[in-house]
């Protein structure tokens, strides 16, 4: 057994241990909403090929740089920067895919889009697209379960 201390991973002091699913992103969004400055886009890259690859590691390094010494206000600003950066990256990928496919409609689904701040930052960046958002069915695993039930019912009716 090693005497080494376990590596602790946390982003800006948020949710070292999560008590429930989604706790860390909820806390990060809450922290970002207390920022007293505009957010800025941190460095990231999108590599084009058969697949698009988004590398946000440079942004994570920027967020972590000197994080131990940050004031609460500075942590809030960096949390906002994270959201702005993720929105910029999603918008860039959407733009590339739109050019490749000619599609102008996008469905924003999945638990990540329960983050209202991410949506607020993303929607203005993709304003020329027709955006579909879930309203009656949750965008997270509950929506997936609903879809699975719908498929099962359809298959039962066809058999």
Question: What are these regions, as identified by a protein language model?
Answer:
Residues 106-115:
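Glycine-rich beta-strand-to-loop/alpha-helix junction loops that act as flexible
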Residues 1-103, 117-123:
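A contiguous, well-structured pocket-lining segment that forms one wall/lid of small-molecule binding clefts
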Residues 105-106, 122-145:
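Conserved phosphate-binding/catalytic loops in two-lobed NTP-binding clefts
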Residues 116-117, 141:
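Residues that form or flank phosphate/diphosphate-binding pockets in enzymes
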Residues 79, 83, 111, 135:
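Glycine- and other small-residue-rich loops at beta-strand/loop junctions that grip anionic moieties
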Residues 149-159:
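Acidic, glycine/GT-rich loop-and beta-edge segments that sit at the periphery of enzyme/chaperone cores
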Residues 17, 113-114, 136-138, 151:
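Short, glycine-/Ser/Thr-/acidic-enriched flexible segments
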């Amino acid at each position: 057994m090693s005497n080494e201390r376990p590596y602790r991973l946390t982003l800006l002091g948020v949710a070292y241990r999560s008590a429930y699913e989604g706790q860390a992103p909820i806390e990060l969004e809450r922290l970002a909403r207390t920022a007293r400055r505009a957010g800025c886009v941190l460095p990231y890259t999108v590599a084009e090929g058969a697949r698009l690859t988004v590398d946000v590691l440079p942004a994570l390094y920027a967020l972590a740089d000197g994080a131990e010494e940050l004031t609460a206000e500075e942590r809030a600003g960096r949390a906002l920067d994270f959201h702005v950066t993720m929105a910029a990256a999603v918008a860039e990928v959407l733009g590339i895919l739109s050019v490749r496919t000619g599609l102008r409609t996008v469905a924003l689904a999945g638990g990540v889009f329960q983050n209202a701040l991410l949506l607020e930052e993303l929607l203005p960046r993709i304003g020329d697209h027709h955006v579909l958002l879930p309203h009656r069915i949750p965008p997270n695993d509950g929506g997936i379960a609903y879809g699975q039930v719908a498929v099962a019912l359809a298959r039962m009716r066809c058999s």
